[in-house]
Amino acid sequence: LIELKTTDADGKISFIADLPIDGTYYVKELYAPDGFVTTGEEQEFVFEYQGDKEVEASYEFVFEDEPTTVELSKTDLTTGEELPGARLQLTDENGAVVEEWTSTKEPHIIKELVVGKSYTLTENKPADGYATAESITFTVENTAEIQKQVMEDDVTKVKISKTDITGDNEIEGAKLTITDENGNIVETWTSGKEPHYIEKLPIGKYTLKEEQAPNGYVVAEEITFEVADTAEIQKVAMKDDTAKGRLIIEKTDKDTGAALKDAEFELRDADGKVVETLTTDENGHATSGLLAIGTYKDGKFDKAATYYLVETKAPEGYQLDETKHEVTFTYVDDKTPVIEVIQKVTNEKLPEDTPFVSNPKTGDDTNLWIPALCLILSAGGLIGMGVASRRKKKKGGR
């Protein structure tokens, strides 16, 4: 090594040296400037004698360096196509921003990145409908070839379930709508046997609204949900409750229409099982709790339920109504959560001088001795009167 120098601001170097005549010498670039590639090019020259009048000899060489070229692609994970609309940033090892840009349908080219240095590609905002990708760090190699770096974005994924109140059965036939924060309709569909799957919803808040519930169900309240910045499947569930029934009993005197209190009833299902026991108040009213209006199979309304109202104890002074009243609830619409049925029941008064008996249970003869005793006493009186009469006749005959 005769001499080592670095180019000046103009990219030039001058070597001045006393060199032996007829020697072969070489000029070689060892290190390229920042952002360029070392070619390894070597220039050779022979220092020849040019006569006693030439004191100096000069040689001129040109070394052409090529810049580094890095191609940065932002693509769809599934299709591999360039993805426009993502905001990207490239920083150096010290965190200084080298360049910022928004992706297009073509790869982004950056030249003159320093060989041997590491850079980080960061996505500051993904394209609409995509999740933010992880940052990529790469090192620039000493080559004039295009160096490619690819950052892939996956789409957002949302799975929406429309189920019954148990959450176990998907409900078919519900009409649903999703709107964004500005009230714009993003998607509409009718629910089926499987959850509804949506891709590419931009990150942000949305509202799920049920426009119409299936037969037998009531429209659910709106749900606000947020699509998070993740490529994982995000789940949203909306549950529909069934419409319910409520029985209202109005108990009155058959003749006067006066309200009757303390009448007792059993509400039984189709199998005869007692669902509820009801007693009328001073207004002659009794109200049941919420009742199933029917049965459901695989999330669908199957058939209407049938109930029977039976009076088990009449109000004091009234005859027991032995009618078995059938009660059913007819589904109205998806905006009516409770269907009310009014059952009017009347009682006739007991005949006058008829003692009131409080409906004894089967096998209970506690009070039966009273009328029996009356009959016995009456019969005894009649017999006594007959004997006395006969005795009087005998006396008269004497």
Predicted regions and their residues:
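Solvent-exposed loop/turn and edge beta-strand elements of beta-rich ligand-binding domains
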Residues: L1-R398
